[in-house]
């Protein structure tokens, strides 16, 4: 059976995992790292870089380097690169393609199916956008699961016989979630979830960037935030400082030649203490505490009921975050999981559940936000409460608001506000053909259906006429089937171009290597090579050099092959001249390996018994 991979598609970093021998295993990328930066960069020559190589050149190419695209999933945001517009789904698909390719290289087989995680507080359009990204990348997304839920699966897989209530605190690069779960007898039941999709490590970085920029402006009168290359250097320095302050109490930020004015170049050289960092980011840390309170209220549990607190996401390494959670909950934090990898591992476990590789595990997740429709007066009428276990189906009967009304518009909303206009519109559709009647008489049954991915379907039926209309929620920010198909084809084109470019690089590198090796060997051999042979090799070397920087790959391959064959021929001639007796036997004859002839094993050795003395020996048992 083909492998299904589990993917944590993160704001700043992504991770891919697979089940092997009943255990989730993180797949290293082509660069050897276990996580991949969610960064995409477009080069001047049309080349596309993804992951660590893209992040590495962000300073020199800030305008064409895209970071943290996950924050725009489910919106109409577009990225314009060289007059071509890309949606967040397309950029995310490029990251997914990289993860898919790395998984295929690791597994040695094609990968076509995946389980992808999303923040628990993602709304419907954000979930749809994630599925679309998977499709564009050539992946069938079998399940979308919430990140804290995935983390709990990874945490609890080897604790199937225990009964625990756990709180998962998930602070990633761009999003924040809290989920309360109950684990017992293989059932992972989410009781409540809360969060903030606009809060994460990026915001901690931004606080530092602003502080450094303001300090520099006060000293030099220059605002570095107006310089794209400078701001990219600040971002890199801020992230590095944040990471260092998780283990050290002070760090140095040193950015030479950050900018220049009439007086000459300007540099940044400043020390930053952990205390100052904590002061700058205090409000962000405090913002994470309210969702803990709300998720507890939603679950019906008190803090004293919680057995374990699982910290997930790279930003939970920040000491101030750990201290705040400890102080707020009054509990020690569990250190048993890797915060960067546990979500992807949980996704792989869910993939194992779907294939049957992981047995006796039941995952019961919840919808994070209230779902309803707009009714008379602009009121948002709830059909499905937040924290309802999914999949679920709920129906309610409504009526018309005016006499003789023959059609109704169903306005589907998601959110916690009492007025529909204050919530997020998921979609609208019209039910027509209602029999004319006084208001309040027609009976219109509205049904909400949420699948295991958290994707919403809504239908409306006139119970009098049997007329029915329905909609699978695809918000205006999501892509149509045609747009997805177009994006899929573009992604395949990119993949083919990347493959061709990689092949070109390998062929040219091979040509370079052979030219270098040939010239080095010629130098080493010196006058052992005749002038005629040397001229012949140099002619072939020149032929390779003439074509190796061009784009005719066949010509490069042919010239390289000609050089290789010529060099091998001349090398053989040199060795024959150096060892005329041994030249006839390439390697040794196994038939010579025996008795007194054991010493004659070298190639072409016809000499007999060159004073070889056989030694007698006997084996004595140990006493």
UniProtKB/Swiss-Prot annotation:
The keyword Chaperone applies. Residues 580-623 are annotated as: Disordered. One of its GO terms (biological process) is cellular hyperosmotic salinity response. InterPro entries: ATPase_NBD, Chaperone_DnaK, Heat_shock_70_CS, HSP70_C_sf, HSP70_peptide-bd_sf, Hsp_70_fam. One of its GO terms (molecular function) is adenyl-nucleotide exchange factor activity. Gene3D superfamilies: 1.20.1270.10, 3.30.420.40, Actin, Chain A, domain 4, Substrate Binding Domain Of DNAk, Chain A, domain 1. The keyword RNA-binding does not apply. CDD domains: ASKHA_NBD_HSP70_DnaK-like (cd10234). Induction: By stress conditions e.g. heat shock. Transmembrane segments: none annotated. The modification Phosphothreonine is found at residue 175. Pfam families: HSP70. Residues 605-623 have a biased composition (Basic and acidic residues). Keywords: ATP-binding, Chaperone, Nucleotide-binding, Phosphoprotein, Stress response. Residues 591-604 have a biased composition (Low complexity). SUPFAM superfamilies: Actin-like ATPase domain, Heat shock protein 70kD (HSP70), C-terminal subdomain, Heat shock protein 70kD (HSP70), peptide-binding domain. Belongs to the heat shock protein 70 family. Acts as a chaperone. PANTHER family: HEAT SHOCK PROTEIN 70KDA. This is Chaperone protein DnaK. It comes from Clostridium botulinum (strain Hall / ATCC 3502 / NCTC 13319 / Type A).
């Amino acid at each position: 059976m083909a492998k299904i991979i589990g993917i944590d598609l993160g704001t700043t970093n992504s991770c891919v995992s697979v089940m092997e021998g009943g255990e989730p295993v993180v797949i290293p990328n082509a660069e050897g790292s276990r996580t991949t930066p969610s960064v995409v960069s477009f080069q001047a020559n049309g080349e596309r870089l993804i992951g660590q190589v893209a992040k590495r050149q962000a300073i020199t190419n800030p305008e064409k380097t895209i970071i943290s695209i996950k924050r725009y999933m489910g919106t109409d945001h577009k990225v314009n690169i060289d007059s071509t517009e890309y949606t967040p789904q397309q950029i995310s698909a490029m990251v997914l393609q990289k993860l898919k390719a790395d998984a295929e290289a690791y597994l040695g087989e094609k990968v076509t199916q995946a389980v992808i995680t999303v923040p628990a507080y993602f709304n419907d359009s954000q979930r749809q956008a994630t599925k679309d990204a998977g499709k564009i990348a050539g992946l069938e997304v079998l399940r979308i699961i919430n990140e804290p839920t995935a983390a709990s699966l990874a945490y609890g897989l080897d604790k199937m016989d225990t009964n625990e209530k756990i709180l998962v605190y998930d602070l990633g690069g761009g999003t924040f979630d809290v989920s309360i779960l109950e684990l017992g007898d293989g059932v992972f039941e989410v009781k409540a979830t809360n969060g903030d999709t606009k809060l994460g490590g990026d915001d901690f970085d931004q606080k530092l960037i602003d502080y450094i920029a303001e300090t520099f402006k006060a000293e030099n009168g220059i605002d570095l935030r107006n310089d794209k290359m400078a701001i990219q250097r600040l971002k890199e320095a801020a992230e590095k400082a944040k990471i260092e302050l998780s283990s050290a109490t002070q760090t140095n930020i040193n950015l030479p030649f950050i900018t220049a004015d009439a007086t000459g170049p300007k540099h940044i050289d400043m020390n930053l203490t952990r205390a100052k960092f904590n002061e700058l980011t205090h409000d962000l840390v405090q913002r994470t505490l309210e969702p803990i309170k709300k998720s507890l209220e939603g679950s019906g549990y008190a803090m004293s009921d919680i057995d374990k607190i699982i910290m997930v996401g790279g930003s939970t390494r920040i000491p101030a975050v750990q201290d705040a959670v400890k102080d707020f909950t009054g509990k020690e934090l569990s250190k048993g999981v890797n915060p960067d990898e546990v979500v992807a591992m949980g996704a792989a476990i869910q993939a194992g559940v779907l294939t049957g590789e992981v047995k006796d595990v039941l995952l019961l997740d919840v919808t994070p936000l209230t779902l309803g429709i707009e009714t008379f007066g602009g009121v948002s009428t709830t059909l499905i409460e937040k924290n309802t276990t999914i999949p679920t189906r709920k129906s309610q009967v409504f009526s018309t608001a005016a006499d003789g009304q023959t059609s109704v518009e169903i306005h589907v909303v998601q959110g916690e506000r009492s007025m529909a206009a204050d919530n997020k519109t998921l979609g609208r559709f019209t039910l027509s053909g209602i029999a004319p009647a006084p208001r309040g008489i027609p009976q219109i049954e509205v049904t909400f259906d949420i699948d295991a991915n958290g994707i919403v379907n809504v239908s409306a039926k006139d119970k009098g006429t049997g007329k029915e209309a329905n909609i699978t929620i695809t918000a205006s920010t999501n892509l149509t089937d045609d747009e997805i198909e177009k994006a899929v084809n573009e992604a395949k084109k990119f993949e083919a171009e990347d493959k061709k470019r990689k092949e070109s690089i390998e062929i040219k590198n091979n040509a370079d290597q052979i030219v270098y090796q040939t010239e080095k060997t010629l130098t080493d051999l010196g006058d052992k090579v005749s002038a005629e042979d040397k001229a012949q090799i140099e002619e072939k070397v020149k032929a390779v050099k003439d074509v190796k920087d061009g784009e005719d790959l066949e010509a490069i391959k042919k010239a390289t092959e000609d050089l290789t064959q010529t060099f091998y021929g001349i090398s053989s001639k040199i060795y024959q001249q150096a060892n005329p007796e041994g030249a006839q036997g390439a390697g040794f004859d196994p038939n010579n390996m025996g008795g007194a002839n054991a010493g004659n094993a070298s190639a072409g050795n016809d000499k007999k018994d060159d004073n070889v003395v056989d030694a007698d020996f006997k084996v004595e048992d140990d006493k």
